[in-house]
């Protein structure tokens, strides 16, 4: 089998992250990629001699870094809640924002009103922008549906976007993100729904690798959280 090599040259800096507590920046070097994997970082002349038929990519003085890994995102959503940012920055607690009609429930109402196709088209440019800015792996949580049909809608949109874009996407089912308004006074009943309906449904279509829960005073308590996580484990998450 013939190996395919590419040498990246004219790099101002290469960030190797060799050490756990520092970036490990190197200058005056080139990088060779062999069959899709970084094979060596060295002087350009040394790499060129070792790989005389390699393709060349002129980085034009750019910086080469590892791809960013962006965990805990809700990158498939409807409208922005940027109006809440000023409130949070000024010290208004999240629970107060939620009481005023903002927070997670605002996103839930928005996502429930949108179709799967709309979520895909709305979020494709957002994920493309993340990729342009250096993110190569992203975890995307659901949690803006809070009922089985809408959690599935979110996760199906995630799957379609993952298939369309050169991003590594890890999907997480977060149906236990908040108690929806219709279950506000029947919290254990909502936990039953998540464990007995939503998690099995997502697992049946292999829509999520992970299962998560928002354990926080005023939201899911320890016992409820344990139930959700154990149900996820039982279904391979």
For the regions a protein language model found, what residue spans apply to each?
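Short, flexible active-site-proximal loops enriched in glycine and acidic residues
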Residues: 96-99, 131-132, 168-170
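Metal-coordinating catalytic core of metallo-dependent amide/deamination hydrolases
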Residues: 107-122, 128, 136-237
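Metal-associated gating/positioning segment near the N- to mid-region
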Residues: 56-122
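Conserved beta-strand scaffold positions in the cores of enzyme catalytic domains, especially
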Residues: 7, 54-58, 171
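Divalent metal-coordination and catalytic microenvironments
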Residues: 11, 31, 36, 61, ...
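N-terminal metal-binding scaffold of metallo-dependent hydrolase/deaminase domains
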Residues: 1-50
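Short loop/turn motifs at secondary-structure junctions
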Residues: 3, 7, 52, 131-134, ...
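Gly/lys/ser-thr-rich phosphate-binding loops in alpha/beta enzymes
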Residues: 29, 35-50, 54-68, 121, ...
């Amino acid at each position: 089998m013939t190996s395919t090599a590419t040498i990246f040259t004219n790099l101002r800096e290469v960030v190797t992250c060799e050490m756990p507590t520092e970036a490990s920046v190197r200058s005056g070097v080139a990088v060779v990629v062999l069959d899709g994997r970084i094979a060596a970082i060295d002087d350009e002349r040394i790499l060129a001699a070792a790989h005389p038929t390699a393709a060349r990519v002129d980085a034009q003085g750019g910086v080469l870094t590892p791809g960013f890994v962006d965990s805990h995102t809700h990158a498939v959503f409807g409208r922005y809640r940027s109006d809440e940012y000023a409130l949070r920055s000024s010290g208004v607690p999240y629970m107060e924002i939620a009481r005023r009609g903002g927070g997670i429930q605002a996103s839930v109402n928005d996502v429930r009103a949108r179709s799967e196709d709309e979520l895909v088209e709305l979020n494709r440019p957002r994920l493309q922008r993340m990729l342009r800015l250096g993110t190569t792996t992203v975890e995307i949580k659901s949690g803006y549906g809070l009922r089985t049909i809408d959690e599935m809608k979110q996760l199906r949109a995630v799957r379609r976007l993952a298939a369309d874009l050169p991003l590594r996407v890890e999907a997480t089912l977060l149906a236990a993100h908040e108690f929806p308004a219709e279950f506000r006074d029947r919290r254990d009943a909502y936990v039953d729904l998540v464990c007995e309906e939503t998690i099995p449904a997502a697992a049946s279509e292999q829509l999520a690798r992970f299962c998560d829960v928002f354990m926080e005073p005023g939201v899911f308590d320890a016992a409820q959280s344990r139930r959700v996580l154990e149900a996820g484990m039982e279904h391979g998450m």
